[in-house]
A protein has these predicted regions:
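Topology signature of small-to-medium multi-pass alpha-helical membrane proteins
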Residues: 2-174
Length: 174
């Protein structure tokens, strides 16, 4: 089974379950033009986003591994560290879904990814600044996570990506 056939099957299942409607609301059916989706700059942008998400996954997994190793060495790891490490991985999984749907041209997914790439770094850095909440290594992990998210936001707000994903026209009320 090829990677493309797996992607096609996943897309068909996603559409059959009407998850775009659930996640995208009234803009669920709005898809950008095919020529903009296939544009080399769009393809390049999504390749960068995928690599940044892979890096975020590595950072999240590294945080869990460090916590496990420190626990095995006899250190007490605060619950906030375990919670944060788990949440980072779950957030990253949702970002993969948004990136996948945006790469297929769904405006709602592009907007969600863009929104989260703005909000998560701010929240993460504010929480990292709370004295004593996390050990130093976890504060560094949060800073790295934020920098990666800012990178995703930077790619998504480039002139090309904003022109590739124009806002949908307002619908007339019935």
């Amino acid at each position: 089974m090829t990677q493309q056939s797996i992607a096609d099957r996943a897309d068909r299942l996603w559409c059959r379950l009407r998850l775009d409607r659930l996640a995208g609301g009234r803009q669920a059916d709005y898809v950008i033009r095919e020529d903009m989706l296939a544009h080399p700059a769009t393809v390049r942008s999504f390749r960068r986003i995928r690599w940044l998400l892979v890096a975020e996954t590595v950072v999240g997994l590294a945080a869990i591994v460090v916590a496990i190793l420190l626990t095995r060495a006899g250190e007490t790891i605060p619950w906030a560290v375990w919670f944060r490490a788990t949440v980072v991985l779950l957030i990253t999984l949702t970002l993969y879904v948004f990136a996948w749907r945006a790469q297929l041209g769904y405006y709602w997914a592009y907007q969600r990814l863009r929104l989260f790439s703005r909000i998560f770094p701010i929240v993460t850095l504010i929480i990292a600044a709370i004295p004593g909440l996390y050990p130093f290594w976890m504060v560094i992990e949060q800073i790295v996570f934020s920098v990666l998210m800012i990178g995703i936001g930077d790619v998504l707000t480039s002139d090309h990506m904003r022109s590739a994903f124009p806002k949908p026209a307002k619908r007339e009320a019935p």
